[in-house]
């Protein structure tokens, strides 16, 4: 019997002939089931989709479609799918923010029964103990796993050594935001197509919000005090909002608010940007064969002011709870393959630069000699080891989260905040207006959500 995997990017379908692998308990000839997998269009997910087309063998009678979707669209579509009980997608890709909330709402399947149903050999080969604890634990509710980490990330500074040398500049290992701004202004040369510093500018709680919330934390800001009073209208918050705008307006890319991480990566790869603050998982594409600055990228710890700009995230795979048991087992088989030690080792065999290798998901990844030798490996580990997940900023807060606030409402209010941030950056509204609107929104959310 023939089985087919289709890799779908937007509207493009690629059919690939595959054969079968048995799940615990054996397999039997059955009617074909169709599994739809949703991935974000970030470099490592695209690499996974490409590799799956040639390397992954689904169970017998399984036809897998992989859809690679722009990140903001993916978040919206999967949130709608999960909250309404839809079954368009069988495998969801998300982060710890969604994992915790969706598991509580019953929007994710508990993975423990699926692990229990594996053969002893398959369980041993997967080696759950090798998953980095902080990453695996962020995907659990009451001790049970509801997702598996594909790759993890913190954040750091990436910079173009050539542009620094040409301008006689030195990057401190632990710079402040003010130091970064001055360095970016010194490099910025729009007449010659050189951008001082690039960052995400496109609105979205997981887009521009990802660097912005850690920036607020670094300036000593917080979003709620311990009594759930909104704390947006403070000098610390205002300083962060102003710094974000100053960097992008005075030393950043053109068309600021269209930039996701994909555009920022491309700009850095071209050699036309000096500094980039973003996820540690973005380093591999900068060191890839397609990058003009491969081998010429410097790395520094995330910027700080009163506090450090902390970031902890992972992209993880979970299962739609509304599908059949056979569909769940088929999805789980793909998840096990894509998060396995064998998959990681294979990515290094295919691309020894590490550009396609998922970072910060497994401890064993850093024992692969070729991976341990890549220029960003050690500093990634160092940054992860210094994270303090329970203390995102200077003063205590009633919520968790380093680049997000772990309450269900944040997907909406965080996205609205970043829209007002974008409006402020491009000059459509004043800082006072942006701060006032965000303060009122967060205060109203605390009351309506029953937090106070």
Indicate residue ranges for each PLM-predicted region.
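C-terminal lobe and pocket-closing loops
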Residues: 116, 282-293, 306-416
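Short, solvent-exposed loop/beta-turn-alpha elements that line the ligand-binding surface or hinge
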Residues: 112-130, 173, 201-202, 219-239, ...
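Extracytoplasmic/periplasmic solute-binding protein
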Residues: 137-150, 155, 178-230, 242, ...
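Glycine-centered hinge/linker elements that transmit conformational signals in sensory
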Residues: 182-186, 226-258, 302
